[in-house]
Amino acid sequence: MSQPFAKYHGLGNDFILLETDASPLPHHLVRALCDRHLGIGADGILLVSPHPEADARMIVHNADGSRPEMCGNGLRCVAFHVAARLHRTPTSVALAIATDAGIKRCLVEIDPPSPEAHVRIDLGPTTPPVTKTIPIPQAALDLLTTSVGNPHAVLFHPPVDLPFHEVAPLLATHPSFPLGTNVSFATPTQDGFAVRVWERGVGPTLACGTAACAVAAAAIHAGHAAFDRPQTLHLPGGPLTVTITSDGNAILEGPARHVFDGTLAAF
């Protein structure tokens, strides 16, 4: 049976979007579709279906088949997809999207037929950051850990000689994090932080919305930033804006882009 799909990305963090109730998908199918040589290629798959208490439901699969609790870039893409399906003229669309981390409120600025939208999301509360010292062969590193619906660990001021591609996966799978964690290296810039992300179940990505929120929350805890003030997080794929409100909610703003549509020959 054939299955239509759409390809989206948020600052290069790319997804295959399927409107289907079939969930969860088998791991082997997710890995095959996300394979960049033998499949469509993506960091993950977004499943969109109806929900009785929201405009849609989003379920996320990472490229390895695992299922994260939340995905900020994926949520922006789903919100854009749903808004564009409902509206064909320039407008601001308020939506509620159900996720494994609860129902999230989104505001989508669309301008058809532009393939890009600006999306603002209230991701809800972050947990108060906690310092964990993690020993690895290279060093003992002090990380700030928090949750934005999914787990994150943030290292500020990483030493320049600390190899990200070696150290980040060690931290992401360290026994101190029984469920694994997303890892961010954050370096101060003139207007925010430069952030590199190792996503649990994916690896290095060009952008991660919840990681940007985790860095913003950790920055306030560390005294680098303040509540209720927008922070700019510079990821390899581009900037995201995050505001942590005085009550701890993370407000994420950034683009979502529709790349192309297609049909899976067999599903």
Language-model features and meaning:
Residues 130-132, 139-141, 170-172:
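Glycine-rich, charged/polar anion/phosphate-binding loops
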Residues 114-124:
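Short, solvent-exposed secondary-structure boundary/capping segments
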Residues 127-131, 259-261:
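Short, charged/polar, Gly/Pro-enriched secondary-structure boundary elements
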Residues 1-115, 154-267:
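A glycine-rich beta-to-alpha transition motif near the start of alpha/beta enzyme domains, typified by
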Residues 125-126, 239:
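Short, charged beta-turn/beta-strand-edge "cap" motif at the junction between a beta-strand
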Residues 134-161:
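Internal active-site segments that recognize and position negatively charged phosphoryl groups
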Residues 120-122, 142-145, 196, 253:
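Active-site-proximal beta-strand elements of phosphoester/diester hydrolases
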